């Protein structure tokens, strides 16, 4: 979607955002603007709903187009990231790499990607739950299943019988935060995992 937008109709800052968003289409982009992390377009719609924060809009282009926008204060961002991550969202943190100046657009870069299963930052983890990421692959007569808590180093590898219900039961029991599969894994099962 974002790669098909004519960026020339937008302000330099919004072009910068859209360029970053092109590289992270399935990720909520937290874009640092001064003392806030802002989200735009569809990210703003999703974040405002999930975080129950106000959705506003911003003038973003030469044709006075206003785009959806919401934001959170930088000093409280951890709380919001934890909420979104616990709901299964991936987040890209885009920080300002220099002080703002009136002469040019501030350089910004993605400084961190947070996913439900790869999160190792104590700020975003719950002390009472493991933070497992799992991987599953189809074997000739069953499934290979590995799950790891990257924050503690705990690693488990096992095989599961052919019937996928065993796998579903393991997912429920372990509260896996994120699953990695490949294209050979049956589509019906991948669709189930998305839920």
Predicted regions and their residues:
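Basic, polar low-complexity surface loops/patches
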Residues: 1-195
